[in-house]
Amino acid sequence: MNKIAIVTGASQGIGRGIALKLAKEGYDIAFSFFSATQRAEELCAEIQSTTAQRCAMYCVDMRKDGAGAKFVNQVSEEMGVPCVLVNNAGRTRMESILDMTPETVDELINLDLKNYLFCMQAAATQMVRAKISGSIINITSTRAERAYPCDAVYGGVKAALNLSLIHI
């Protein structure tokens, strides 16, 4: 049975590095990306050319309600139940409290909080049903712990995520 890892937001940065490392450790990789199609294709090609692992990329707008859970469930159906979920997709928005908009607040809550919670719920449900003892890893930020200028929304959302994780 192949080990399957899901990494959200893996077309670049931290997520890309995590996906490459997991592939080198013997995991088949399913990852989401949003707009960096060329980078996503390059990552899949690199995984397939440097390891013997399968790689599948999914264009997912994690800002949309239900998108994260749908992605996890789709991967489970198409590749098998994951034993690792790495929640990494996110976006940093630095705005003064005077300039923030309801759209910015909604975007960051959906992407950096709700998405993480519902991806975890979907992955944990799949793992429990399949009797898989898996791992769920959530990438957060030091911005949850320290005050930064123009960071009320992003830092607040990451702090909410960190506190939620303590209670799971």
State what each model feature region is.
Residues 141:
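Residue(s) in the substrate-gating loop at a strand-loop-helix junction
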Residues 27-42:
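Conserved glycine-rich Rossmann-like NAD(P)H-binding loop of the short-chain dehydrogenase/reductase
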